[in-house]
């Protein structure tokens, strides 16, 4: 079987999620400190047990997917007294563990595919987790960009567009290994194989593919291969400005996919701070900022604005202390209003994160999700029925 057939027919779990007007995902805090270099009180933990509780509860509440980021940091992480992100677990292994604890929710793993991976390895590992989960696994393809990370693996840093040339060949081979019934031999520009074969195949033909590119080369790659594309506000964390800037960005991505006879969906990452009153929500926002670890915050901020990631150039230091791409602060009604506006701006989904994950997730489930259903953003648990 070749790649000529539309890839969309293979995406049953994602298509079920898309029965909702707004796809709903949860970022998992698999690194110490999660998204916020702050010492304001919270119980968030990087441990597998804590993240398993988050994933299981998200599934019970009707979330469509959970997602873990990947990173490679030296001793002490981003530093500071809190040693921000000194500990981080591997998302591929975490999602493999979650496959045994969940039944319906999509499990997305982030993998830096250029840090020594061969497509055959990842095709086999991915197909295995996909079968373990009943067809619910997806891959977030990351090329890497930090000089220090490449050096950890004994590699020279690679030029930005060249990374996506490598990723394009890697992903093409990956898809062939999942989709084709014959052994594959390849003498490629970057990878070689002889009589390579993967069995069992992913349950739905091939696994869900995700990417968070924003540059020209990155988006060209993403619309060719990805089913779900993370978009980043090009104007920073202010949701008012984001909702004004996102429509042409989302339209450009979807138009690019349509030219290739493909369908892609876009999803954005809001950090949600929700309380009964607006005053309480902004008080929590202030507490996170007031208790920031200044050394960790500085290092975290400089890492992103100093790299070649086009999407983060407008981010402020305050944004990195709070975490997430856009900041949604307010009452349950206000949060839902922002979700509606993000939907109107062309986003097909939101991938939320919190400061104090389990209690904030529970509050979100009890207070925000019912309003999302009332607003027509969510169809309820029926979208997840097997």
Question: Where do the protein language model's features map onto the residues?
Answer:
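N-terminal beta1-alpha1-beta2 module of alpha/beta enzyme domains
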Residues: 2-101, 201-207
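An alpha-helical appendage that flanks or caps ligand/catalytic pockets
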Residues: 3-30, 59, 160-203, 233-344, ...
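Hydrophobic, small-residue-rich alpha-helical packing segments that form membrane-like cores
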Residues: 7-13, 25, 40-41, 98-106, ...
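Acidic (Asp/Glu)-rich catalytic clusters
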Residues: 16-19, 59-60, 96-104, 126, ...
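Hydrophobic faces of well-ordered beta-strands that scaffold small-molecule active sites
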Residues: 22-26, 66-68, 107-109, 137-141, ...
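Conserved, mostly hydrophobic/aromatic
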Residues: 24, 58, 62, 98, ...
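Active-site mouth loops of central-metabolism enzymes
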Residues: 34-49, 110-120, 156, 203-216, ...
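Glycine-rich, proline-tolerant flexible connector loops at the mouths of alpha/beta enzymes
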Residues: 65-89, 113, 233-246, 352-365
